[in-house]
UniProtKB/Swiss-Prot annotation:
GO terms for cellular component: cytosol. Catalyzes the decarboxylation of four acetate groups of uroporphyrinogen-III to yield coproporphyrinogen-III. It catalyses: uroporphyrinogen III + 4 H(+) = coproporphyrinogen III + 4 CO2. It comes from Protochlamydia amoebophila (strain UWE25). It is found in: Cytoplasm. Homodimer. Belongs to the uroporphyrinogen decarboxylase family. NCBIfam families: hemE. It holds the Pfam family URO-D. This is Uroporphyrinogen decarboxylase. One of its GO terms (biological process) is protoporphyrinogen IX biosynthetic process. Pathway: Porphyrin-containing compound metabolism; protoporphyrin-IX biosynthesis; coproporphyrinogen-III from 5-aminolevulinate: step 4/4. Its EC number is 4.1.1.37.
Length: 364
């Protein structure tokens, strides 16, 4: 921990890029150091979906509020974001929200059903549906996110990660209408209406840029883009329908703030993600991180990549696997320990605590 002046080194390696806002001397900047590949102590640890249903404190709130009510209430956004910080002392907070707030702002109707997941009430079925989607000229409908970030600022002693969904993943929900097993509808658009599909992706990307810039202005310290369904794409499809729009978003951010790109399929697409020069690439659990370092050199950080199912294992096995990954990445100044995807809802808090404590017990 140290006095941190919110100094963010450019993703193009321009070390004099400075963002203001002085943070107190108790601020834990370990994640930000790792995102600059300058961390000389133990790796930072945070976990995707760390503020979720596996926490008893979260489930208690869900008994009082719907998921969307919690996403729309700035005080609840702040409260839920802080739950894993208080429970586990992880090295970063990730904003409590959902990747479907942009489709909600686009008025396609979003609801969440228990044991089903997100449902799009008015899915995209034709070109006219795409043409009707508004451009991001007014972000008033997302003001609750900005206010949630502002509620968090005085209460955090770790970096806050803002996020959005990648255009391809968000479009998948908007076209399929819900989580899909085969993605036939979106593949139909790719092959039969590619230009219309590109129009949709561009609109989502423009909304994503405006939304992420709003989060930057509100005070987040880093960003992550989730491309959860990229693993359904062929290599050429990934280049055309995902990577191009991630690059477009990266260029549209108004400040040199660290950006983590995570996609399912990063064991294949990782070098391509690195080619557009984010601060970090998030890896799924199907690759060996050390080998990815051979093809993704400094100054790009690597984040990941424990199997999420590890958290169902006996506690000694969790410690063993965490220590094996820490040993493998020993001395890597740009390594961030995380899962290869989000925490499952029925995982025990004891398992998560064991993972985090194993990292925190490392020297430094």
């Amino acid at each position: 921990m140290r006095l941190y002046l919110n100094v963010f080194y450019s993703q193009k390696n321009a070390p004099n890029s400075v963002v203001s806002n002085i943070i107190s001397s108790s601020f834990n900047d370990r994640l930000l150091q790792a995102l600059q590949c300058r961390n000389n102590s133990r790796p930072p640890v945070w976990l995707m979906r760390q503020a979720g249903r596996h926490l008893a404190s979260y489930r208690a709130l869900r008994e009082k509020y719907s998921f969307l009510d919690m996403c729309h209430n700035p005080e609840l956004i702040a409260e839920v974001t802080l739950l894993p910080i208080e429970a586990y002392q992880v090295d970063a907070a990730i904003l409590f929200s959902d990747i479907l707030v942009i489709p909600e702002a686009l008025k396609v109707g979003v609801r969440f059903e228990d044991k089903v997941g997100p449902i799009i009430e008015k899915p995209i079925t034709n070109l006219h549906d795409i043409e009707k989607l508004a451009m991001p000229e007014d972000l008033t409908s997302l003001e609750f996110v900005k206010e949630g970030i502002r509620c968090l600022q005085p209460r955090l002693n770790v970096p806050l990660i803002g996020f959005c969904g990648a255009p391809f993943t968000v479009a998948s929900y908007m076209i399929e209408g819900k989580t899909s097993r085969d993605f036939k509808k979106i593949k139909h658009w790719m092959y039969h209406e590619p230009q219309g599909f590109h129009t949709l992706l561009r609109k989502i990307a423009d909304w994503s840029i405006a939304y992420l810039n709003m989060q930057i202005d509100a005070g987040v310290h880093a960003l992550q883009i989730f491309d959860s369904w990229a693993n359904t794409l062929s290599y050429r499809q990934f280049q055309e329908f995902s990577l191009n729009y991630l690059k477009y978003i990266l260029k549209g951010l108004k400040k040199d703030i660290p950006l983590i790109l995570f996609c399912r399929g990063s064991s294949v697409f990782g070098p391509d993600l690195a080619s557009i020069k984010p601060a970090a690439v998030g890896l799924d659990w199907n690759c060996r991180v050390k080998r990815m370092r051979d093809v993704i050199p400094y100054p790009i950080a690597l984040q990941g990549n424990l199997d999420p199912d590890l958290l169902y294992a006996p506690l000694p096995k969790i410690r063993e696997e965490v220590n094996a990954l820490l040993d493998e990445m020993e001395g890597d100044r740009g390594f961030i320990l995380n899962l290869g995807h989000g925490i499952f809802p029925d995982v025990s808090e004891e398992a998560v605590r064991t993972l985090v404590e194993t990292v925190r017990e490392r020297r430094g």
